[in-house]
Amino acid sequence: MRTIIFGAGSDLGVNIDGASLGPQQLMNDLTTFYQGESIMLNQDNSIIKSRNLSDRRKNEYEIEKFNSNLYKNIIEKVKEEYFPIVVGGDSSVSIASTFAEAKANIDIGIIWIDSNPAYDTFETTQTGNIHDLSLAAVTGYKCNDLKYYHEGKIVQPSHAVLIGARSMSEQ
């Protein structure tokens, strides 16, 4: 099976700019030793991110648009028998990559290594940043609004492992 690396340059899911730059730099550095196929997807730089502290759905439309494009690209490459590796900016891109894999494979699991468990919902998020909802969305926990483009399987919660999480919300 061939490998394809997707650079998913987006920081729309967080309030601090810069996470979108990492995938581009990594893709540039990979050219010295990786000869396989790669695709770089970047967020639209004309987007003005929400800085409204009371906005509990920051950049939801823009993230949906970016993730829908990433999702479609991954599904297309999986059909061509590629194994996708997605290098993201913020963790909201994991929603698209996980749903694409769930659609392509019968049963998947996820190992989430992060101090942020990303298991908030639109009701429990304190920041409104969608990266805080990523793991909840892919395991089907109260975030169905984030699967606009995906009809199908989710990651079963019993197949999700958290490593390094500092704490979980009581909700």
Q: What annotation goes with each model-predicted range?
A:
Residues R2-Q171:
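Conserved alpha-helical scaffold segments that buttress catalytic/binding sites
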